[in-house]
UniProtKB/Swiss-Prot annotation:
Keywords: Amidation, Neuropeptide, Secreted. The modification Leucine amide is found at L17. PROSITE patterns: PYROKININ. InterPro entries: Pyrokinin_CS. Belongs to the pyrokinin family. It comes from Periplaneta americana (American cockroach). Mediates visceral muscle contractile activity (myotropic activity). Mainly in abdominal perisympathetic organs and to a lesser extent in retrocerebral complex. It is found in: Secreted. GO terms for biological process: neuropeptide signaling pathway. One of its GO terms (molecular function) is neuropeptide hormone activity. This is Pyrokinin-5.
Amino acid sequence: GGGGSGETSGMWFGPRL
């Protein structure tokens, strides 16, 4: 969902940003 290690649903950034 937000600046993490890429979620399945609702990817805001994807990798860690």
